[in-house]
Each structure stands twice: as C-alpha cells, then as structure tokens.
Amino acid sequence: MNTEATHDQNEAQSTGVRLRNAREQLGLSQQAVAERLCLKVSTVRDIEEDKAPADLASTFLRGYIRSYARLVHIPEEELLPGLEKQAPVRPSKVAPMQSFSLGKRRKKRDGWLMTFTWLVLFVVVGLTGAWWWQNHKAQQEELTTMVDQSSAELNAGGDSAQSVPLDTSEAASQDSTPAPTAPVDSTATNAVPQTPDASATTTAPAADAQQNAVVAPSQANVDTATTAPAATGDTASLPTDQAGVATSAVDQNALVMNFTADCWLEVTDATGKKLFSGMQRKDGNLNLTGQAPYKLKIGAPAAVQIQYQGKPVDLSRFIRTNQVARLTLNAEQSPAQ
C-alpha cells in the first residue's frame, strides 16, 4: 500500500519538483548541480520550475533533464511521461534547400562580368595602340613630305647654281685681266667659308679687284709698268681685309651642327631664306651663317649636336618625346618652340 501511494504521489509531481526534492535530499545546491552538469545556474532553475527556455532546443533540454536525473539517482523511465509534457519534441524548422540554379545564375553573372571587363581592357589597349600608330604614321608622313620638298628645292637650287659658272666664264673670256689678278681671286675665294652669305660677300670685292686691275694698265704708261704689280698688290689686299671683316661679322651668328646619325634638317634665317634643307649623313658637319633669329626643323633631334654663338643648344625635351624638333634661336641663344 505504501509503495503504491508513493508511486501515485511521484506521478502527481512534475519532473522539476521531483528533481528538486531529490537534490535537497542529497544536500546539493543548485550551484553544485550546475557545476557538475556544466550548466548555468539559470538553466538548472528553469528545469526545476518546469520552464522550457525559448532559446534552448527541446533535444538539449531533454538531455539536461536526463543528466540531472542520473545525478540525483532518479530512474529515467519514471521521468519519461513528464518529459513528453515538459519538453515535447518539436520539429525543427528546416530551411528549404536552395536549388543549384541560384549558384548557376550567380556563376553565369560573374562570367558575364569578367567577359565585359576583358572586353573593356581590350578596347582600351586597342585604342591606345591605334592612337600611337596614327601619331607615328603622321610623323613619318611629315618627314617624307619634308624630304620631298627639300629634294625639290635642292634640284631647283642646283639648276640656278649651275648658271653662275657659265656667266663668270663668259665674263672672264670677255675681260682682258692681267695674269697677277688670277691668284688674288683664287686666294680670296678659298679664304671665305662655303656659305651663301659669305660667298656673296666675297664675290663683290673680287669683282672690284678685277675692275681695278683692268683700269690700272690702261692708265699707266709703259715706263711705269714696274709699279703695276705694286698697285695690283694693294688692290688685292683690300678684298682680303674686307673678307676678314665679313668673316668676323658672320661668326657672331655662326650656327655649327655635328651629326651622329642620318638626319633631315631645315634652317631658315630671319629674312625667310633657307640656309639649308635636306639630309645630313652620319659624322657630317654643317656651318651656317645668316641673319638671326634662325628657325630650325630637325627630324631626329637625338642625331644632331648644335652650337650657337659658341654655346651648346639643349634639345633634351625633343629627344624625350621623340618628335620632330621645331625651335627658334634668337640673338640671345634662347631656343623657343
């Protein structure tokens, strides 16, 4: 009778009450139970008060109750009916599996993005290459045009230059100049540099010398023939002095160029006269004189070294950009673009 009464009384008590009574009979506190079961004191208190924490899954709660029952020596079979009521098994909400189509769509989108990125890069590289090629082609065409123009001008200049020796030869055949005057002309001609202005400067004194040489014999008597060479010597010295003065004046604006490679060049002075236009070969030298300022067009700035008024001209900014150099050299040697 007592056993049945005890059994009925245990069934009437809830799971939490039975666990609390068993704990108190063993003289354990909630803190001690929590330490042995590695639980929080609040979790032990909720179990004894038959509370199911919302943040705790029913599976874990049933496991904690069974561990608590073994600790206080209560058979688990006696607690099963109460467990079904206190911690019923609740089906967990399983999120539906996402289909692989989402991953495929994302992968496809990434593929399109990469394709578009590569396409943009190819377009940028292509446009850059086309821009560079157009600039390079334009420079080559400009150089070709300059070379053609210089060749045509040189041919025209050659035709006009060939007519000069014919005129001088005819003049020499018509004039009866004495023999001593010929060395004076050749000496004056060799003393002056082969430049357009210098040649023009030297020709005028030479012509004066020829006129003086022609007049002197006509006015002199036969008895004074010995004085004619002295007069001729005086007249010959005059063009030499004039050539020296012209040379010193020209040297003030002298333009000296040394070439380390083949280079196209065009030089124009202040009057618009082209002092030179054409190709210069490697290891060539060019000395020009004219009226400053000079305007220069250089096809290959890296292939030429320029000295103006005895000072070097800086072409580094044209060499870095690898472009046709267009500059002006004024009297103060300040090259300008």
Swiss-Prot record:
Residues 30-49 bind DNA. Residues 19-71 form the HTH cro/C1-type domain. The keyword NADP does not apply. Residues 160-192 have a biased composition (Polar residues). Keywords: Cell inner membrane, Cell membrane, Cell shape, DNA-binding, Membrane, Signal-anchor, Transmembrane, Transmembrane helix. Residues 193-217 have a biased composition (Low complexity). Cytoskeletal protein that is involved in cell-shape control through regulation of the length of the long axis. This is Cytoskeleton protein RodZ. The gene is rodZ.
